[in-house]
Regions:
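Extended beta-strand/beta-hairpin segments
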Residues: 1-53, 61-147
Length: 147
């Protein structure tokens, strides 16, 4: 564990928190009032599923303006994040993000241009993707709530 001086001070913009609601069950919060149930049971996301949804939606949020310009402001889309897991190391080895939308109105050249623009938008704006690509240091601090 790190020394207390290494603790990043939580703020509304750099942190989320979760409170324990039962055995292996937490309710996660952000400063904007959103909540998500985290656990292994019905109606709950596992931490791994949250990581997948974070990457998937980071991609689509980063590219939304490009997709809307090509497909129309009210376009319908779904995004899927599938993974391969290295069971021995208890980690995901590969992430595959699939954006699914009606692309039939685009000819092959338009589709190629849109694909490149979507990739560039994601490369510019997806913090979750950048973090997974480059890695990030993680630290654990066990803190006394009375101190």
């Amino acid at each position: 564990m790190s020394e207390p001086s290494d603790v990043i001070t939580p703020t509304e913009t750099n942190s989320v928190w979760a409170e324990r609601t039962g055995t292996r069950r937490y309710l996660a919060h952000n400063a904007r009032g959103a909540e998500v149930a985290v656990g292994m049971g019905p109606g709950e996301f596992t931490p791994g599923e949250l990581l997948k949804v974070a990457l998937a939606t980071c991609n689509t949020l980063s590219a939304d303006h490009r997709l809307a310009k090509a497909l129309g402001e009210d376009f319908d889309a779904n995004v899927i994040c599938a993974t391969l897991k290295n069971e021995e190391e208890e980690r995901y080895s590969d992430f595959d993000v699939q954006i699914v939308a009606d692309l039939t109105a685009l000819d092959p050249d338009q589709l190629a241009v849109l694909t490149e623009r979507v990739r560039r938008a994601i490369d510019r704006g997806c913090t979750v993707g950048h973090t997974l690509d480059k890695g990030a240091a993680t630290r654990l601090h066990l803190l006394d709530d009375e101190g």
